[in-house]
Amino acid sequence: MKKKFALSFVALASVALLAACGEVKSGASNAAGNSVEEKTIKIGFNFEETGAVAAYGTSEQKGAQLAVDEINAAGGIDGKQIEVVDKDNKSETAEAASVTTNLVTQSKVSAIVGPATSGATAAAVANATKAGVPLISPSATQDGLTKGQDYLFIGTFQDSFQGKIISNYVSDKLQAKKVVLYTDNASDYAKGIAKAFREAYKGEIVADETFVAGDTDFQAALTKMKGKDFDAIIVPGYYTEAGKIVNQARGMGIDKPIVGGDGFNGEEFVQQATAEKASNIYFISGFSTTVEVSAKAKAFLDAYRAKYNEEPSTFAALAYDSVHLVANAAKGAKNSGEIKDNLAKTK
């Protein structure tokens, strides 16, 4: 990644490899679940490998596959090799639900890793629960997503956490007394971060503007912002629009810090913004390649670089972590229900 880009402020120093899953509330399945096969353990991948947010899904697929390869090379789980059934949900919520049904009823997987986004995860979980198969999303951040869902696990922080961290960072580190809030109004993810930011920020929000996913021309809103007195722009949203916003803002001479959530994460954001304009940018990341990491995280970094000849994003790291969580929970398990129970006990 080009170093002109002011890399992430890291809310968590590094991904906690083999960390605990997200909170699990009430709710249950009447299904017995899928049995673990005699010679293999089937795990389904349900990732956004094409479509609007393919950068997230393809990164997660790579991280997840790396974990599978390492586990299998080390002898598998209880001597059984992991068999991956990899499906593309095309960045569509309906397809994520359909893929889940296929994985649990046709492929008979014992666990699912993915989707990446909150919307797709919310669409997928009902079909997984009905079949008694646990689903872990490496990166779904929507608050309350696990409420009432015994079969859903989350591998990252929530939107409300991100909004508070952004507020703290712009106030304490950037000394921003006045900000502009520019939110993707079509995204529950973005709206969740914006809501938490508004509640936590003690300074003045001098403008509260919105855009919609798929927009490409942001000059009208940016022109309005340019006439304001502010110290930073907060952009809750995904890289697909945020990168273009950075590009156009810098092209108009707006050089104030631009701050976002984990949706900025990845090389694709820099490609959208262009390297020469992607400066003075800050975003949250659960993993960073530029800070000191643990021995386990370094082993992941080295292996990922060797396999793919590129830097891993936080999405790759979280998916790698998620597969290890599933593998650990599958030890000694006879069916998907027992894998779910073991995931729920993970600390």
Range-by-range predicted roles:
Residues 1-42, 73:
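Short, low-complexity disordered leader/linker segments with a strong preference
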Residues 28-31, 56-62, 74-146, 211-215, ...:
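Beta-alpha junction/loop-to-helix N-cap segments that form part of ligand/metal-binding clefts
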Residues 35-63, 87-94, 116-117, 182-191, ...:
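Extracytoplasmic "Venus flytrap"
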Residues 103-116, 136-138, 178-183, 229-239, ...:
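Periplasmic-binding protein-like
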Residues 118-129, 220, 232-252:
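Hydrophobic alpha-helical
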Residues 152-213, 232, 326:
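An alpha-beta-alpha
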Residues 249-320:
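Extracellular/periplasmic periplasmic-binding protein-like sensory domains
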Residues 307-316, 327-347:
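Segments of small-molecule ligand-sensing domains
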